[in-house]
Amino acid sequence: MSKLIERYSFGKIVDRGEMPHFLEFQINSYEDFLQAGVAPQKRENKGFEAIFNEIFPIESSNGLLKLEYLWYEIHDNDAPLNDELECKKRGKTYSGQLKVRLKLTNKKTQEIQETLVHFGDIPLMTDKATFVINGAERVVVSQLHRSPGITFNKELNIQTGKDVFIGKIIPYKGTWLEFETDKNDILNVKIDRRKKVLLTVFLKAVDFFMTNAEIMNGFFDVKEVELASLYEKYKGDELDEILRIRLEGSFINEDILDEETGEFIAESEELIDNIVIEKIRENKLSSVKIWEVKPEDRIIANSLIHDNTKTNDEAVIEVFRKLRPGDLVTVESARSLVKQMFFNPQRYDLADVGRYKINKRLKQDVPEDVIVLTKEDVLQTIDYVKKLVNGEGFTDDIDNLSNRRVRGVGELLSIQVKGGMLKMSKMVREKMTVQDITTLTPQSLLNTKPLNALILEFFGSGQLSQFMDQSNPLAELTHKRRISALGPGGLSRERAGFEVRDVHNSHYGRICPIETPEGPNIGLIGSLSTYGKVNKYGFIETPFVKIEDGKADFNDIEYLGADEEEGKFIAQADTLIDEDGNF
């Protein structure tokens, strides 16, 4: 008979509690997308529910027809195809039927039709976080991509040798905004990484400020400079020098008139240069009201000096001409373009993660449901770029895991589905216009082929949908926890440089530094570490033990993301600690 053998562990790390569920993120991601087991009225606005709410209602161009979404249901397929093992044997896809309750309102005939429309089949996830597609078991690998939000960085202009400071507002969907300085110390805004406009033109175009005077009030202090005593105290070149130090580079706040002739000595908003100073001295003005430009505000003042637009109408037309050169422009069409670009949630979406990142980086508390650009976002970004120019603040490391997030299968599929639904909605609008509206039904309006083709393509031949490695149970588990920087919306192996592939200190406890393929994909494909978890925003967290007064409390374990561990002293997991928790 064999005796029970006592096992000894020679590892430095003692048992630190239960390991997390290894497939929790993958399963939750798809469950959140489908919300199959949730009653329609209790569903959260995410996944399929969010897509339907965004696409519907669909209205005809004349406003007579309106197709509304009520709810959706997912039904099991008939036996035997409702069983994953049977699907494997028969070479079929393990899926459910997506049925959507729609309401068509005909305002001309006052007729309302409510129907449950079959949208097609949607693959279901097995308990092991896999999909059975045409009899083969497949895994959708999670994607590591650049997080929406805000980043600040510094680049060297090789021609001038000067540092260029850039603040980027990156939305989840929509137009990128880059606030960058140039060789002349002017702050510009680059729209969608292509067209560059002056900061002050942009601020007026988006209606954050109406005029240059409003911009000056927003960024500069109004100050009355007393001059009478200077004329008595200083003379000649010395007086010129003092006036230049006090006034040059600022802006006149109010029109200055010659009381005898009624002529302008200087106009409001005029830059105070040598000529204006000469006029002030000649007329022996007792005081001058100015907008004082401090050294840190010089980049704003330089933008104003080069800005030829006076009102927001002129500014919005200039932005339109930069974005759509050659197109016929009116104030209304230009306003519509800018509004669609930054303030329409269907075109510009920061998502909850983007809003969270912006709030955290700029120390704001804008509600998370505000997913479009706000005046506060832009002004705080400008302030931070000013800080960087003046040697304050810090730039971001784009390879830090606080600036990279994981997209699970649910999020990846929702991007595909949204594309299919948009195509479908365009076809519905065309049918509403062309066909006889008295004979139309929800079924006849909808063509779900583009949607089904995209879903099939995603699971069948998508770059992140892979045939599961089944050589042993460990290989299977590793494949499901794999994270790839490749795929749609990610990096390409040809363009990815050394920095993005390299091991980063923020990977500690989050991504395995060893397990990565050799060859062209090195560093672009990795695996979640044993204790690594993905939080609701998609950032990878790892557990930490709190140390207070030199004592470790293993009952107080906190999961922190890479952004939350900044500014804290961190010791390695294998640091020697005695039985009482002392270092």
What are these model-derived regions, one by one?
Residues 1-484, 529-583:
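N-terminal non-catalytic structural scaffold regions of very large proteins
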Residues 113, 482-513:
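Flexible, glycine/threonine-enriched loop-and-boundary segments that flank and lead into catalytic domains
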